[in-house]
Amino acid sequence: MSDMYHQLPPEIWVKIMDHLKEVSLLLTNKDFFGLFNLIDVEKNMIEHIVENGYLDVLKYIDSLKNQNKFIVDKEKFSVKSLDKYLIMSCEFGHLEMTKYFVSQGANVKTDNNMPLRLASQNGHIDTIKYLIENSVDVRANNDCALRMASLFGHINVVKYLVDMGADVTSDNNFAIIHTARSGRLELAKYLAEKGADIRASNDSAVIRASERDI
């Protein structure tokens, strides 16, 4: 990629970037990164980096900041909130980035345990295990993690959370009711085996299942 950079003068690359409206190329190596001095990028690059899991790039930017380099002393490289970026890394399942933010001081329980909720909702089992191993309460917010994992059909996550102490009957058997509504027979059977009440809320789960011919 560095060889490609040197095939064209910087001003041509700037025009290409302006035309493509794609900033990821600027993150491929130090040569392209230097074009940030010449290109007006409106988006916050830290958010873009976190969404895509570019941990090495994030560490490189942090090293430049520690050296007080002008190129990263701009709004597009500003860190709005470590906790916010931790939440994002958990949402997208970037485990190593999650660990990095925690090492920098981010709170794994931030925003009412939002990291665990979003990791469970999106089925990122390794991130979930890391959070729980680092003192996040598996039963936080009335077993929100279990309810979200059930709602979105992540059976491996549900099983892990139950093994760690989550209650399948929380919120008036929310998990099995919504699992039945979604037609996820295997997960519904598992929840019932673990004590969820199939007849809760006036047989809501049974009705939902019958509507789908389960």
From Swiss-Prot:
InterPro entries: Ankyrin_rpt, Ankyrin_rpt-contain_sf. ANK repeats lie at residues 41-70, 81-110, 111-140, 142-170, 172-200. PROSITE patterns: ANK_REP_REGION, ANK_REPEAT. Keywords: ANK repeat, Repeat. Disulfide bonds: none annotated. This is Putative ankyrin repeat protein R844. It comes from Acanthamoeba polyphaga mimivirus.
